[in-house]
């Protein structure tokens, strides 16, 4: 399969609190497949998963064909943390992670004895690219009195530099707990999610200035215009979005919680401000309801991501089949880094086990709003 190369610009912070520069990366864009090619690859992948004693673990943002394959073969389609938990607890010898690189690394850290493969090792994340370990470590060293809290969307090396790793599902609770104990915090890398948590908790947080290139593109002014066009629609927003977008939301939540909201709430129409890959699962979970993509650019403007992560798009049927056939693209994490990175991950998991209860929505938006204030994993 031939792949086009797409240039991708992303926020490139040099230090927390500093103005962002612009970084440039690239992503491969797989060619579209004919229906018979798709069907043949799906059948081949199913056979290879059995042969390799492997399980497919896919993120909500990857191609719908990969999500369907994971569901059909006893795998998992989930947010980043549940992907890692599922892989850790599954008895398969090989985990095939369809997502971006930090997800594969986290799976390997939690399952060091398993083989972890990815369709494309170059599938990365703007948050990861925008928070390099050497620069981040220098900033942390300049503020040794602060507790370092990093989001899941970071490299294993950055996690190894942290005191806590959080997903958005538990980030509010952990930061609130640290704040109640009088701790001051360094937060990285997503400035929008960090600002949302800071506003909710009142914590003293120094922010790294990274952003998700998909969510950073959503526009509050255009979203408000779309809301006026569809006044009956409820607005579902991921908290990596800018503050002006979050302010318009009926529900702020993770991928999992936004899907839950689409199912539980009485509305028949939703405007969705997150990666459009989620629409596959939303339509399956809430058939008959209408989902409208939130705008990612203003009048006459050109979107960069157009609401779909270019690196998530690198996961394709063809390279999934190839990695299972050849056994390449294996994820390795240096032992010392993995050992250090496991500590902040385990702290989060232990905290979650002690405190977290599954969010259940009743369908009453006024009653459920407090539930959705505690957002879920990316």
Curated annotation (Swiss-Prot):
GO BP, one annotated term: 'de novo' NAD biosynthetic process from L-aspartate
EC numbers, comma separated: 2.5.1.72
Annotated binding of [4Fe-4S] cluster, by residue: 125, 212, 309
Primary location: cytoplasm
Cofactor(s), names only, from the UniProt record: [4Fe-4S] cluster
Cell location: Cytoplasm
Short name of one Pfam family: NadA
InterPro entries recorded: NadA (IPR003473), NadA_sf (IPR036094), Quinolinate_synth_A_type1 (IPR023513)
Binding site for iminosuccinate: 59, 80, 151-153, 168, 238-240, 255
Record keywords: 4Fe-4S, Cytoplasm, Iron, Iron-sulfur, Metal-binding, Pyridine nucleotide biosynthesis, Transferase
Gene3D superfamilies: NadA-like
Cofactor: how bound: Binds 1 [4Fe-4S] cluster per subunit.
Pathway noted in the entry: Cofactor biosynthesis; NAD(+) biosynthesis; quinolinate from iminoaspartate: step 1/1
GO cellular component, one term: cytosol
Reaction it catalyzes: iminosuccinate + dihydroxyacetone phosphate = quinolinate + phosphate + 2 H2O + H(+)
GO MF: 4 iron, 4 sulfur cluster binding; metal ion binding; quinolinate synthetase A activity
Function field: Catalyzes the condensation of iminoaspartate with dihydroxyacetone phosphate to form quinolinate.
Family of this protein: Belongs to the quinolinate synthase family. Type 1 subfamily.
Protein name according to UniProt: Quinolinate synthase
């Amino acid at each position: 399969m031939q792949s086009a190369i797409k240039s991708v610009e992303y926020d490139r912070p040099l230090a927390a609190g500093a103005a962002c520069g612009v970084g440039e990366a690239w992503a491969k864009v797989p060619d579209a497949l004919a229906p018979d090619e798709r069907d043949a690859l799906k059948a081949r992948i199913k056979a290879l998963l059995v042969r390799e004693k492997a399980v497919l673990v896919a993120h909500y943002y990857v191609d719908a064909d990969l999500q369907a394959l994971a569901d059909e073969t006893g795998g998992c389609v989930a947010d980043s943390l549940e992907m890692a938990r599922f892989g850790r607890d599954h008895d398969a010898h090989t985990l095939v992670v369809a997502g971006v690189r930090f997800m594969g690394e986290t799976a390997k850290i939690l399952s060091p004895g398993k083989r972890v493969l990815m369709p494309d090792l170059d599938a990365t994340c703007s948050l990861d690219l925008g928070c390099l370990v050497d620069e981040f470590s220098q900033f942390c060293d300049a503020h040794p009195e602060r507790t370092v809290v990093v989001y899941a969307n970071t490299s294993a090396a950055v996690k190894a530099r942290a005191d806590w790793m959080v997903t958005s599902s538990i980030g509010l609770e952990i930061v609130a707990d640290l704040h109640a104990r009088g701790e001051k915090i360094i937060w990285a890398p997503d400035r929008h999610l960090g600002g949302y948590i800071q506003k909710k908790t009142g914590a003293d947080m120094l922010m790294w200035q990274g952003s998700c290139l998909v969510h950073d593109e959503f526009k509050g002014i255009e979203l408000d215009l779309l809301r006026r066009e569809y006044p009956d629609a409820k607005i579902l927003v991921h908290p990596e979005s800018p503050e002006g977008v979050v302010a318009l939301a009926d529900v702020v939540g993770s991928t999992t919680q936004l899907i839950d909201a689409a199912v539980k709430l009485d509305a028949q129409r939703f405007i969705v401000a997150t990666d459009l890959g989620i629409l596959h699962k939303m339509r399956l979970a809430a058939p008959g309801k209408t989902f409208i993509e939130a705008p990612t650019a203003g009048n006459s403007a050109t979107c960069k991501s157009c609401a779909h992560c270019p690196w998530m798009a690198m996961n394709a049927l063809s390279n999934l089949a190839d990695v299972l056939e050849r056994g390449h693209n294996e994820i390795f994490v240096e032992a010392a880094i993995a050992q250090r990175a496991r500590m902040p991950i385990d702290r989060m998991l232990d905290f979650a086990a002690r405190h977290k209860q599954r969010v259940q929505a009743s369908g009453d938006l006024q009653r459920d709003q407090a539930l959705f204030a505690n957002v879920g994993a990316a």
